[in-house]
Every structure is written in C-alpha cells, then in structure tokens.
C-alpha cells in the first residue's frame, strides 16, 4: 500500500492506473476506521481493480459549536487496517493541501438538508459537498462507496453527482452492525458501559417503525410515538434529537407510502450523538 500526502503525487498515481485501463474504487473517510469502513473497502476490492481510500478530517463540515480538534484521529491504526483490507493508495492530506487558500467560490446545498442533521448542523453539508468535489476531482473514481448509516449525506452526495455530471457510480452499502444491532460508529467509543448496553434500542425502535409501515400503517404520529416509547424504555440517553419519517431521497413529507421512505433517528448520550436509519422501498445501488 502506498501512503500519499500531496495532490500531485496522487494525480500521477491515479493517471498511471487509468492509462493501464484499471477501474478505480474510492472510499472517502474521516479516519478512525472501523469495520463499517472496511466493509466499504471490501466491496470496492471486489468491484474495481484499484482501491483508493482518503483519510481527511474536513474542517469545513464542522460547525462553530463542534470541536474539530477533538475528532478522534489515529493514522497508524488507520494505515494498518487499510493495508490489511487491501487498499492500494491511502491518501492522507493536510488541511493546507486540500484548502491551500480561502475559497473563491462556495457550494451551497439547497435541497434534502432542511431537516434532520441538515437542520441541526447549518453549513455541514455545504462542507461535505465542497470537500467531496475536490476529492472526486483528485481521485477520478469509477465507483465511490458510502454507508447507508449516513443516509442524508448519501442523498446529498447523490444530488451533487447528478447536478454536476460527475461520471461516478455511487455504491450505497448496508449499515454494518455490532452483534446486538448497534450501528458501527467511531463515536461508539464515547459511550459509557451502561449507554453501550442500552444503545441497541435505537435500531430496535427503527425496526418497529419498519414493521408498522410494511403492515400498512400510515399514521405518522402513531409510528413515531411507538418508536419513541421503545427508545425511552432504556433511559440512559439524554434526549432524542430526532425520530422522523421522510420520503427518500427527497427528505420531504411522506405522501406516497409505496415509494422510498427513510425512518431516521438521532439519540444523544452523555458524550456521543448516535444516528441510525432504516430505508423502505429503496433499492441500494
């Protein structure tokens, strides 16, 4: 595995693979890798000839009340997992490499962000599409791999790729879970022992919501209340940041229960905010 830190070296390495008619699979991450990330790598390994992973904690997607400096980082750990997983290039740029000067033009997401994390984290998805536009141009992948757990981000990135004609096939991979159903996340390390024991209730509640919808229930308030009651059976969380249903990928109110729907949850614990979701009537690409 080659570790690359600057743009020019990356572009030259990618060009060499393109000239050899190799397909490129790309897994963008913010590091602190876990099994969920490595599942994305596994799919990329199977479906493309050459796998690129980036590890970059992107400052433009952190809000004023979010601690960019406190985000967990462990490059040695990430490099070890990436190499073991079959990554060919690990791109680990500095902030200065990606943002050498103040941006003269800025991207602004106008749809799919007025609810959930988009509502709570103003400007967050603007930062996501900004950095991905830069990284997509540098890596020039055939396939890019994202996890379903970040479903709103996936919807936003899908819009970016469609709007700006990126010749990239987005591959959306099912959420990787612990044995008890908790979605794998870098933030799980912040849970106390009691919180970790109770956190799987988030997924249990989402499955209850799925079951109700698939059995024909269309009373949104009832569905949300059933899920809320389920989560509140385990009292270690501080609050439920959101628990909601929307059309997917539009993130508008549900009007047709036979089309794509997302049930999304965010639950705040003492030192971690966990998100999870279930997609209904949605085909992953």
Swiss-Prot record:
Biological processes annotated in GO: pantothenate biosynthetic process
Residues forming the catalytic site: 37 (proton donor)
Domain of life: Bacteria
Binding site for ATP: 30-37, 147-150, 176, 184-187
Binding site for beta-alanine: 61
Signal listed as a keyword: no
DNA repair is among the record's keywords: no
Record's keyword terms, sorted: ATP-binding, Cytoplasm, Ligase, Nucleotide-binding, Pantothenate biosynthesis
Gene3D superfamilies: HUPs, Pantoate-beta-alanine ligase, C-terminal domain
Ligand binding ((R)-pantoate): 61, 153
Principal place of residence: cytoplasm
Top-level class of the enzyme under EC nomenclature: ligase
Coiled-coil region list: none
MF annotations from Gene Ontology: ATP binding; pantoate-beta-alanine ligase activity
A GO CC term attached to the entry: cytosol
Classification via Pfam families: Pantoate_ligase
Pathway(s) served: Cofactor biosynthesis; (R)-pantothenate biosynthesis; (R)-pantothenate from (R)-pantoate and beta-alanine: step 1/1
Subunit structure: Homodimer.
Family: Belongs to the pantothenate synthetase family.
PANTHER family, alphabetized: CYTIDYLATE KINASE/PANTOATE-BETA-ALANINE LIGASE, PANTOATE--BETA-ALANINE LIGASE
Role, per record: Catalyzes the condensation of pantoate with beta-alanine in an ATP-dependent reaction via a pantoyl-adenylate intermediate.
Protein known as: Pantothenate synthetase
Gene: panC
């Amino acid at each position: 595995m080659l570790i690359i830190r600057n743009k020019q070296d990356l572009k030259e390495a990618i060009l060499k693979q393109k000239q050899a008619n190799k397909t490129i699979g790309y897994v963008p991450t913010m590091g602190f890798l876990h099994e969920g990330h490595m599942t994305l790598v596994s799919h990329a390994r199977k479906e493309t000839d050459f796998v690129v992973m980036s590890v970059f904690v992107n400052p433009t997607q952190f809000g004023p009340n979010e601690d960019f400096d406190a985000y967990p980082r462990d490059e040695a750990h990430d490099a070890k997992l990436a190499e073991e997983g079959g990554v060919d290039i690990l791109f680990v740029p500095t902030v200065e490499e990606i943002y050498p000067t103040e941006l003269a033009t800025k991207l602004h997401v106008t749809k799919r962000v007025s609810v959930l994390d988009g509502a709570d984290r103003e400007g967050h998805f603007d930062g996501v599409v900004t950095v991905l536009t830069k990284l997509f141009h540098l890596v020039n992948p055939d396939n890019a791999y994202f996890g379903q757990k970040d479903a709103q981000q996936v919807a936003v990135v899908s819009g970016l790729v469609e709007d700006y004609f990126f010749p990239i096939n987005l591959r959306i991979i099912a959420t990787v879970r612990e044995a008890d159903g908790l979605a794998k996340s870098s933030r799980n390390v912040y849970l106390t022992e009691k919180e970790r024991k109770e956190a799987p209730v988030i997924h249990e509640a989402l499955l209850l919501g799925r079951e109700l919808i698939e059995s024909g229930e269309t009373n949104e308030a009832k569905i949300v209340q059933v899920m809320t009651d389920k989560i509140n059976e385990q009292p270690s969380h501080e609050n439920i940041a959101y628990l909601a249903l929307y059309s997917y990928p539009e993130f508008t109110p549900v009007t047709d229960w036979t089309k794509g729907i997302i049930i999304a949850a965010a639950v705040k614990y003492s030192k971690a905010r966990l998100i999870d979701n279930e997609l209904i009537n949605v085909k992953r690409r």
